[in-house]
Amino acid sequence: MPAVLQQWIEKSEERNRRIQQLRNEVTEIMELNVMDVTYRMLVEFLADEEIEHISEMDYILRKKYEVYMSELIKEKSVSRYLRIFDKVKQEYIRKRIETPMGRLECQWTYKNTILFIPYHSDQKIVLSVERVKNRSNMVWDFQIDSSEKMKRQIFDVLEFILENYEPSRVREQKLTGLHIFYEFCRLRKIEDINCLEQVQEEDFQIFLERKIENEQRRNRLRSIVGLACRITFLQTKEIRWDATIWYLEKFKIPKERLNPSDPVERISFREVLHPENRKLLQEYMKYEIGIGEMAISTVYEKFRIIRNFLKEISDEQQKVTTCDAERIDQYLKKRQEDANEAKTFNTQVTSIQYFFKFLEVRGYVDKVPFRAEYYWEKQILVHHDRCVEEDVYMEIIQKLSNFPEHLRMMFLHLWCIGLRISEVCTLKGDAYYRQKGDYWMKIYQVKMKNYKRVPIPEALYDLMQVYLNKNRIAKEDYIFQNRKGGAFSKSTFNEQMKKYCAACDIQNGEYLFKSHDYRHTVATNLYDHGVSRQGMRCRKRILSGRR
């Protein structure tokens, strides 16, 4: 028998063996009694591709099958055959993950290949993408020649989106935005998303404009950069101290240092372009956050002052370690001209002094190159009359029924007791209690980092009991919550109050609501009715005439 014929016979026998093997697997997996033409075509294609088992089916093979069928049948019918390909693969995964070995084999993990979301091991995710599986954002090519670290970071963000966003337009926007951002990172040779620079993010916005014509859709997609930076920072085992943006939820900061009603969520070092200056600022912030005890809001205020200083000298390509008294004098005199109050300017001087003192202790400079006391300005305490006129707050009370319930309750705490808005926002379900016929409230003072108790009107106590029961607020829950169940934002409260004051035409629409004014109003009323300043300090912790 000729050798060529012998080879043909052997190949034919091998093909028939593969067909039988695959037919048995498909029949078992899909629980078929009879194979129709769609299954037969699939089996024959797999056999021709020398596929031995269904486990070898993947997205690359799917694309080949699509091309193969396009040459045999009408284009509109190809999708029918692709659905069968997907069903077989998905059913195989679904049944295999029921076993320990199968879970290990089919687990959705990062691989240097093309990943197809409909082949995810989580069946809930598979079902959620059934109607959108032909979109480009379902296909993720991790076999391209690019930074391995960047590709793994993109995969982590992809997983976060799939696991944390329900099937919706928002998830589609996140997936599409990430898909475009991944392409951008590949083309711009981004090595590490954690080290993304401001100029690169701005470049991405230009890249996005070329990709997406619709401005509204562009605006929805552009936020993906922030999400990618946040997730990649949070999911690393060790804190990335070299990252250009730090996200504070990564740090185990004692709650006494945090203000839940006005949280500092991130710290950006991107503005400081000089590498050495940025590194020193990162070292300083590592100390302030990790070892320091100041409230994070105070730390952040100092940070911004130092960052502005370093940004200016970095733009001049000057190292902070080479700054002399003359250069600092130039900078501080500029700030002196810009500052509205002596207190503001003195804070700037002190913050820069502390930073140089840190550099001195760490051995980066021999000594602080300027004397802060030379620049300090005398602070003259001025009483700012910020009291709300009676006709104003009475008009609000008369129209309070037009405000949402949570705003009504929060406003009453300002008007009745004179609390700080940060204290109102962080009240918890166990704040109110009755003792010996009197009504009290337990408050955590963010500013003082301590608890205090104050007497409250019986009417407010009764109203809050109804509110707590109606909204099923547990003892440890925040009474006024944001969408995620955390403390209500004080900035959101102020914005909403301004909106409803305008809508209710308070003072003919000219009244500008300021929450802290009500604290001054309560203090002034107490003083006018004979309560001494010392009495107000002890009882309400309110200093007359001070912010």
PLM segments and residue spans:
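Short, charged phosphate-coordinating catalytic segments
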Residues: G363, L414-Q435
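Basic, Lys/Arg- and aromatic-enriched nucleic-acid-binding interface segment
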Residues: D391-I421, R519
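Short, basic (Lys/Arg/His-rich) helix/loop patches that form interaction surfaces
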Residues: N494-C538
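Conserved tyrosine-mediated DNA breakage-rejoining catalytic core shared by Y-recombinases
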Residues: L427-D462
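Active-site/catalytic core of tyrosine-dependent DNA strand-transfer enzymes
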Residues: P457-E510
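Alpha-helix N-cap/helix-start motif at helix boundaries, enriched for small hydrophobics
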Residues: V299, M410-F411, S422-L427, M536
